[in-house]
Amino acid sequence: DAEPAELAEMQHEFDLHPLAVEDAQHGHQRPKIEEYGDTLFAVMHLGEHENGRTDDLHVGEVDVFVGRNYVLSVRDRSRHGFLGVRARCEREPELLRHGAGFVLYALMDAIVDRYFPVIDAFECELEQIEEKIFSPGTARTNIQQLYDLKRRVLVLKHAVAPLLEAVGKLHGGRVPQTCAGAQDYFRDVVDHLARINGSIDSIRDTIATAIQVNL
């Protein structure tokens, strides 16, 4: 997590917009992408299961400042870094010709990829509950587990749905100049987010049906 002094130094060095810096300093922001002149400020949420445990969902935040010649990321409550993103950019330097927008895409792609194992775990957990849904004497336990799963699925929904809406603006219509060279890549992120969002809605519908069966 960045200290206030570090953010102040970044603001001075890169002429970052004060409102974006304030958001990064306070954290707990809704996923979004905002334009400040010729720069972008993006907020994304990480949803991760820790140490193989699927009964708890750890949510972190990554704030990203994107300018013509720089990309700065600030992590808040996020336990994993993005060395893989740097390695990818170094492994495929020709893609950097698309500018800072490609680095933003690579960061987004890495974050979105981490949603898929969470979805898989949710679906597996739901299947396990469904297998015992008609077993005698399990209704109370089933409902407790279903409501707990519903809560965690909603947390992921709040990470995915706003980001899907925001990223859609980076490949269609008036694309911010900072990302103009990488707009085709953002379409790939939108496709992944739409798939994940659809899976979340399907899981929520199944949970609602299962709760009704147990009532």
Name every feature range the model reports, one short phrase each.
Residues 1-202, 208, 212:
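Peripheral, non-transmembrane regulatory/ligand-interaction domains of membrane transport proteins
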